[in-house]
């Protein structure tokens, strides 16, 4: 994850990856984790996602981490929330408001406590292959024993399109989360009318995974 790349995306408001509403995958498949209200939730590379609101309605503690300070400030400003802000270092800030705890800074160094549940819709696929193993090592360290992950990935021929978002095929998911129980909940194949297929991709699929420690 090149910091400058994502900082520029937010600074210029080129955020096509941001959804204006709750992701339907979250609402459809979160129950597969058998979540409980008192279980803590971690959302890596959270942006200013509406998914955070949906999760906070169902859990007492939702923690996120986001590289872009612009995104974190926008999350609270757009909801008219006034968070408590703590400067942890020259490059890391902590924003807290009710159920929300969001770190503004580097995912790899933010002091995030292990959570019961993790939701990764757009984090793993945002990273190039050479960064994904380290990312998952850190992610696994932030999951409690008995914890569960809801993971969303994409599968396409990486030679046909430059990411992000990047393709993370099934064999890589299996390798990254080796030793954990991995269940594919959905594979949604794009049809001929899908924008990615119209742009020339030979295949494009979105996959949803339940990963249990």
From Swiss-Prot:
It comes from the Bacteria. It catalyses: S-adenosyl-L-methionine + a thiopurine = S-adenosyl-L-homocysteine + a thiopurine S-methylether. It holds the Pfam family TPMT. Its EC number is 2.1.1.67. GO terms for molecular function: thiopurine S-methyltransferase activity. S-adenosyl-L-methionine binds at residues 10, 45, 66, 121. GO terms for cellular component: cytoplasm. InterPro entries: SAM-dependent_MTases_sf, Thiopur_S-MeTfrase_Se/Te_detox, Thiopurine_S-MeTrfase, TPMT. Its main location: cytoplasm. Disulfide bonds: none annotated. It is found in: Cytoplasm. The keyword Glycosyltransferase does not apply. GO terms for biological process: methylation; response to metal ion. Belongs to the class I-like SAM-binding methyltransferase superfamily. TPMT family. This is Thiopurine S-methyltransferase. It comes from Aliivibrio fischeri (strain ATCC 700601 / ES114) (Vibrio fischeri).
């Amino acid at each position: 994850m090149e910091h400058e790349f994502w900082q520029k995306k937010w600074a210029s408001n080129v955020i096509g990856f941001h959804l204006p509403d709750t992701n339907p995958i979250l609402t459809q498949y979160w129950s597969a984790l058998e979540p409980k209200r008192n279980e803590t939730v971690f959302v890596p590379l959270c942006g200013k996602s509406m998914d955070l609101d949906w999760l906070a309605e169902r859990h007492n503690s939702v923690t996120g981490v986001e590289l872009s300070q612009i995104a974190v400030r926008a999350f609270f400003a757009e909801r008219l929330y006034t968070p408590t802000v703590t400067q942890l270092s020259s490059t890391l800030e902590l924003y807290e408001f009710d159920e929300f705890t969001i770190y503004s800074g580097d995912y790899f160094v933010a002091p995030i406590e292990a959570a019961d549940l993790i939701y990764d819709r757009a984090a793993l696929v945002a990273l190039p292959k050479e960064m994904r193993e380290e990312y998952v090592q850190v992610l696994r360290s932030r999951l409690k024993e008995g914890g569960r992950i809801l993971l969303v990935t994409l599968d396409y021929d990486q030679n046909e399109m430059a990411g992000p978002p990047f393709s993370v095929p099934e064999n890589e998911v299996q390798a990254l989360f080796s030793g954990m129980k991995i269940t594919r909940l959905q594979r949604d194949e794009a049809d001929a009318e899908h924008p990615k297929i119209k742009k020339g991709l030979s295949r494009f699929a979105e996959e949803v995974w339940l990963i249990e420690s």
